[in-house]
Amino acid sequence: MNTEMVLNKIDELSEEYIGVWESFCNIESPTSDKAAVDEASEYILSFARKKGWDITESIQSVSGNAYCITMNADSAEKPVCLSGHVDTVHPKGDFGYPPVKIDREAGKIYGPGVVDCKGGIVSALLAMTALSECGYNKRPIKLILQSDEEISSISSDKKTIEFMRDCSLDASAFLNCEGYSKGKLVIQRKGIIRFVFDIKGVVVHSALCYNGKSAILEAAHKIIELEKWKDRDGITCNCGIISGGTTPNTVSENCSFVADIRYATESELEYVKKRVAEIAETSYIGGTSCSVSVKSERICMEKNERNMNLLKRIREIFAKYGIADVEPGGSNGGSDAAWMSYYGIPTVDSICTCGGSIHSKNEWAWLGSLADSAKMLASVAMEI
């Protein structure tokens, strides 16, 4: 058995696993619906049980359960870990029924999670199946199913992240199966921190508005300050949710808004926290007060030598087997890969199906990218 045999087996299995991809994505699994997320995970677990692979679980009361599937669990070698999240962002029914559509003529599949991130899970499952059917038994290969990634693991209080860490600490490589950007594998990602600003003003009738202090007006000033952060490679801010006021003829006493701030380095995060505190403490119109709290946080994935060395080895493997070369890439979006990198595990992100319009009702992927990404994963698992 050799790597070429496994890559050929992936081609043989590709059409069958396009069907798996379709069926998996037809099981809609918004993060907030635990039963739906668990149902989607169970679909993948059913394949593992049939193949006799080991399954460990992290049972959650609010979020979906997280799982780790292991083939070759008896091997003493260091494992390679593959990972993807089962949860998606849209409520059930947003894509119509059935949610997934395949356009063979265009070579595309459309639906919730076809790229982010169910496509990645299926490509990992395809890679593992090909390895298993070709008799590969050298090292453990793990597939970790995350359940609340889309909301930064708030609902599990980061317990799913801890589970991922515990399953991966001894890994020779952690390959996160987020959406693939053609020609690049991600080795650095921005962190995300979301702040809630709660502003209190002075309420009066709008006929006497000059005697009041509008919480909405104060929020506007604060938002203008925050939204000055628009550095593509550094700090950015988007204030995407706001609520306040009671009636049109009342000066608003209360206003709340949420700021989504992204940063590239830990030093930038420290600056963000300091500046946010200053903006919260400053009353731009006078006579208002403001409290600020952290709603959620996801750490950044900083570029480091450990991950660069892993990428270098991956490129050597790809060159050996005629797989298209990749370059180091970055992303402004958050990912659980950042946590694994933080814990010292050699990590590369975005080895997955390739497509576009992620998080929209037009999310799509190239059908051919399923086999392509599975070959990437399988070759690394064997040769790293």
Residue ranges, per PLM feature:
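Short glycine-aspartate micro-motif
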Residues: 79-81, 109, 172-176, 194-196
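Active-site metal-binding loops of divalent metal-dependent hydrolases
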Residues: 29, 86, 149, 179, ...
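Metal-dependent amide/peptide-bond hydrolase catalytic core
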Residues: 1-5, 12, 59, 90, ...
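Hydrophobic/aromatic beta-strand patches that form the interior of the parallel beta-sheet core
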Residues: 80-82, 144, 173-175, 346-351
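A structural signal for isolated positions on well-ordered beta-strands in alpha/beta enzyme cores
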Residues: 81, 142-144, 238, 291
